Swiss-Prot record:
It comes from Corynebacterium urealyticum (strain ATCC 43042 / DSM 7109). It catalyses: 1D-myo-inositol 3-phosphate + UDP-N-acetyl-alpha-D-glucosamine = 1D-myo-inositol 2-acetamido-2-deoxy-alpha-D-glucopyranoside 3-phosphate + UDP + H(+). Catalyzes the transfer of a N-acetyl-glucosamine moiety to 1D-myo-inositol 3-phosphate to produce 1D-myo-inositol 2-acetamido-2-deoxy-glucopyranoside 3-phosphate in the mycothiol biosynthesis pathway. Keywords: Glycosyltransferase, Magnesium, Metal-binding, Transferase. This is D-inositol 3-phosphate glycosyltransferase. Transmembrane segments: none annotated. UDP-N-acetyl-alpha-D-glucosamine binds at residues 23, 231, 236, 295, 317, 325. Homodimer. Gene3D superfamilies: Glycogen Phosphorylase B. 1D-myo-inositol 3-phosphate binds at residues 9, 20-25, 78, 110, 134, 154. Mg(2+) binds at residues 304-305, 307, 331. Its EC number is 2.4.1.250. One of its GO terms (molecular function) is acetylglucosaminyltransferase activity.
Length: 424
């Protein structure tokens, strides 16, 4: 089976935690690689963002990234990308025509890609599944200071995708409810496929590994360390963590507390690193906070291992892959009781869930684990068992089962008028 994956606005080659690259990048790359291991062939079409990028990049046996030229390489924000939908679609069609390619199924990611896939599905006369990752109707319910509302045009485009895709793939049952409440949808056409973690790469560390990770970061071995990994946008709540940390430092004057924030700026609003550094300075905790640039997975392992607990004070998360990665390394997670985080964290066993983003409530939850070694250690021991339920291999198997359950398209249809790759 040959799959055309569409990821217009962000490439699986980009470093997660920077710009618009995040969990979706991790999701696409890992699922594509696992699908290939199951015998499928996957081409991932994305927009070229650098002039020296090769048109085709091999990710491994059976997986390619196709960099399609659509507009200038640099200088376009995600909000401006809808102006390049036609150009991107044309590049996809030109590539497939030039190389005589055909596919059995299209899997699009995010609403921009869904608009492209909608046209390609009719041109190629093949099945189309779509994973939204985020939804305008949900994001607009969780705006933070300085954030812009998602435009009505996006919500309209998402409704068109919901109406026309053969199957809409979501991460959790909670997301099924989001689609049903925010859009006119047919539940029978929504499938739940849970994401995963690279449980071979993210593994529990030994006591020595933790010591080495802390020494490399210049953190005292006796410190209580709170980790944060993700894009620095207010939706992710790094400001909430800093405010909670200030309360903890005042509450536990004899406890050496340190905060590690690993990630880069993204999105709109007051999320730039400088703003967070200024906030730490205003709170009087700048000496206890370290800001780290985004790191590849093999280096993220040591960040998780250096932490006693990982905090995810997000206003909303469709799932929260960081929670799985942290737990896979044996680090408990404190997360907001919202969206997919309610499934990603086993409350009371691998971590704690907090209602909302009140800094005092977050200080209480974090303080509970930092001050109770027995509870924290018990959660650290259980966390990898919980994360092991969510491997990328299992995700890929669910996807293959879904792909193969779809009936083939009738022979007479759009493909009769528009062969694959033709724009006639």
């Amino acid at each position: 089976m040959r799959i055309a994956m569409i990821s217009m606005h962000t490439s699986p080659l980009e470093q997660a935690g920077t710009g618009d690259a995040g969990g979706m990048n991790v999701y696409i790359r890992n699922t594509a690689e696992q699908l290939a291991k199951l015998g499928l062939s996957v081409d991932i079409f994305t927009r070229a963002t650098r002039p020296l990028q090769g048109e085709v990049v091999e990710l491994g046996d059976g997986v390619r990234v196709i960099n399609c030229v659509a507009g200038p390489y640099e200088g376009l924000s995600k909000e401006e990308l809808p102006t390049q939908l036609a150009a991107f679609t044309g590049s996809v069609l030109a590539f497939t025509r030039q190389h005589g390619l055909s596919y059995d199924l299209i899997h699009s990611h995010y609403w921009l890609s869904g608009q492209v896939a909608w046209l390609l599905r009719d041109l190629w006369n093949i099945r189309w599944v779509h994973t939204p990752h985020t939804l305008a109707a949900v994001k607009n319910n969780y705006l933070s200071e300085g954030d812009h509302r998602e435009p009505e045009s996006r919500r309209i485009c998402e409704q068109q995708i919901v109406d026309n895709a053969d199957v809409l793939i979501v991460n959790t049952d909670a997301e099924v409810a989001d689609v049903e409440e925010g859009y006119d949808s047919h539940k029978a056409r929504i499938a739940v496929v849970t994401p995963g973690a690279d449980i071979e790469k993210f593994t529990p560390g030994t006591e020595r590994a933790t010591e080495n990770a802390r020494r490399a970061l210049g953190i005292p071995l006796s410190a209580k360390v709170i980790g944060f990994v993700g894009r620095l946008q207010r939706l992710k709540g790094p400001h909430v963590l800093l405010q909670a940390a200030a309360t903890l430092i005042e509450r536990y004057p004899d406890m050496p507390i340190r905060v590690l924030i690993c990630g880069g700026p993204s999105g709109s609003g007051l999320e730039r690193p400088k703003c967070l550094e200024e906030l730490a300075e205003e709170l009087g905790i700048s000496r206890a906070v370290r800001f780290l640039k985004p790191r590849p997975p093999e280096e993220l392992v040591s960040i998780y291992q250096a932490a006693d607990v990982v905090a995810m004070p997000s206003a909303n998360e469709s799932f929260g892959l960081v929670a799985l990665e942290a737990q896979a390394t044996g680090t408990p997670v404190v997360a907001t009781r919202i969206g997919g985080l309610q499934a990603a964290v086993a409350e009371g066993k691998s971590g704690l869930l907090v209602d909302g983003q009140d800094p005092q409530a977050w200080a209480d939850a974090l303080g509970q684990l930092l001050s109770d070694d027995d509870q924290r250690i018990a959660m650290a021991e259980y966390a990898p068992q919980h994360a092991a339920r969510y491997s990328w291999e299992n995700t890929a198997k669910q996807l293959v089962e879904l792909y193969r359950s779809l009936p083939t398209m009738p022979e007479e249809g759009p493909a009769e008028r528009h062969p694959a790759g033709s724009a006639n």
